[in-house]
Amino acid sequence: MKDKVNVATSTFNHTPVLANELIEIIKKLPEDLIKNCLIIDATIGGGGHSSLVLETFPGISVIGLDQDPKAVAAASEHLKIFGDRAKIETTNFSNFTPSKKVAMVFADLGVSSPQLDEGSRGFSFRLNGPLDMRMNQIDGTNAAELIDRLSENELANLIFKYGEERFSRRIAKRIKHDLAKQGPYSGTIALAYAIAGCYPPKLRNRRVHPATKTFQALRIAINHELDVLSVLLKKAPEWLLDDGLFAVISFHSLEDRLVKKSFLTDTRLERITRKPLIATTNEISINPRSRSAKMRVARRIEAIK
């Protein structure tokens, strides 16, 4: 099987991470389920993982969820060749409940490559765009509104809590000073430049951009990412058939710690991966963003009758 699976539409060009590992995990389902079952792709994005699953397992159907209307449009186009085996809904997974038990729930957390690579979405500190960062650009508070509303202390606490940024106090002070002196930032690059200026000179040119942690913190807060993940971790085991699988790919330590703790303590689940699955050297060379991906998998324990 090829290491690279590329999904391309007019608006989405995304290489799903740990795709081969996902296929191998699905093979752990009972044989009778693989022949005829339903799985939930809780973060369908451009449809890359689901496309590979549907192609590999003719007996499996997928319900795909995403709160990003652009992702839903891309996935719908990409998966239309599978007919009624693929159904897609525009919703956050925390608001969803299936009408029947399913064989697997899968979630690929965080921001997709198309969202990062489209400056107008406001996620990127390398491509200029408005300070937005909302997964669903129709609803909710954007990044510009958030940093304007919070006090310096509240902003520093947010950056430290969700970004684990050691210079959070310095960064928050600079942001609030700039807003008071010159008004809103012109875009993402202006904010990233201000953040970089809060780092000691010797730390500004490392592989990880100085704005990475602050942008992560703002994005997590704006989209309530850890809150909705906690909801999924609580609800998903109830959606599963006995011996059904629950797989989550995370991209930073805050997400991974939540998933790890849930899989360890939830009595409805047993881990089938003691350590997280990570990308191969070959995959990382093809898709550098897979470097930080970790997949944890658990199985639904048979409920006591």
UniProtKB/Swiss-Prot annotation:
Gene3D superfamilies assigned to the protein according to its UniProt record, in alphabetical order: Putative methyltransferase TM0872, insert domain (1.10.150.170), Vaccinia Virus protein VP39 (3.40.50.150)
Superkingdom of source: Bacteria
Entry EC number(s): 2.1.1.199
Assigned GO CC terms: cytoplasm
Keyword S-adenosyl-L-methionine: yes
Catalytic reactions of this protein: cytidine(1402) in 16S rRNA + S-adenosyl-L-methionine = N(4)-methylcytidine(1402) in 16S rRNA + S-adenosyl-L-homocysteine + H(+)
KW Nucleotidyltransferase (keyword) present: no
GO terms of molecular function: rRNA (cytosine-N4-)-methyltransferase activity
Protein's cellular compartments: Cytoplasm
Binding site for S-adenosyl-L-methionine: 47-49, 66, 93, 108, 115
UniProt KW keywords: Cytoplasm, Methyltransferase, rRNA processing, S-adenosyl-L-methionine, Transferase
Pfam families the UniProt entry points to: Methyltransf_5
A single GO BP: rRNA base methylation
Record's function text: Specifically methylates the N4 position of cytidine in position 1402 (C1402) of 16S rRNA.
Family as reported in the entry's similarity comment: Belongs to the methyltransferase superfamily. RsmH family.
Name this protein carries in UniProt: Ribosomal RNA small subunit methyltransferase H
Organism whose genome encodes this protein: Prochlorococcus marinus (strain MIT 9211)
